[in-house]
Amino acid sequence: MAVPKSRPSTLALAFWGAHIVAVVGAIWIGWSWAALWWLAGSYAVRMFAITAGYHRYFAHRTFKTSRVFQFILALLAMSSVQQGVLWWAAHHRDHHRNSDQPDDVHSPVQRGFWWAHVAWIFAAREKGTDFDRIRDFAKYPELRWLDRNDRLIAVAWGVVLLAIGGATALVWGHFVSIVVAWHVTFCINSLAHVLGSRRYATSDDSRNNPALALLAFGEGWHNNHHHYQRSARQGFYWWEIDITYYVLKLLEAVRIVRDVEGVPRHVRDRVTAPNRSRVRAVATAAVVVPPS
């Protein structure tokens, strides 16, 4: 059952307001090495939390971890202000069930660039969290609390950064970092199904895009990902840079996470010419929603 979160007009006001604050604030504060460090550091933390947390853990369960680190991942990911952890993962599971089909929540093939990039988020019917889709994580009360308090988390992050680093940290480490992380994440939806190469015959138009892979810590190897969603590794070959996977392996080495899923050789090497219709039924059946 989907629980409404906010009116689209309220969300749009906050979204565009953040852009205005980021631009005006950056001009007002100005550039400095401190500003650059705040931007780079906060972006790196956010992007790892989005890609490892929201995507590879909560949406796809490609590795395991403790309940404590699960909460930390969710909290860090929610600093990106991309709505609640359960909302994000539930919608992403829907995307994989219907990728580039009429029911896909953010397909550029079906609705165009602008819809896939950001407009879908403002649609009233997409405002709720479908807890039935994410029952495996919705059973944790602390994650439900985070999910319904996404605005509080966003404000709290801003207050903490302001207290630590002043106006420079607030503007560059919070607002500018958030806006940049937004659009890099959104480009996976809007561009990684349009621009790039196709190694595998997935049932959608997913592409491998090296530039997006660098910016999004490995998420740009999107055709790889749609070919085999169970893997925590999206850069299937050594030359396909996947920063999030490298960090996950380090965390596995120190036992913070475990059972980080790789790519079976026979899956990786099964290169075929693109043919969407031929594999639609197979891909639909392959989307795994873990039992509650």
Describe the predicted segments one by one.
Residues 25, 112, 196, 218-220:
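Glycine-centered flexibility motif
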Residues 1-187, 191, 231-292:
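Non-catalytic, topology-defining segments of multipass membrane proteins
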Residues 190, 194-199:
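Transmembrane-cytosolic junction motif
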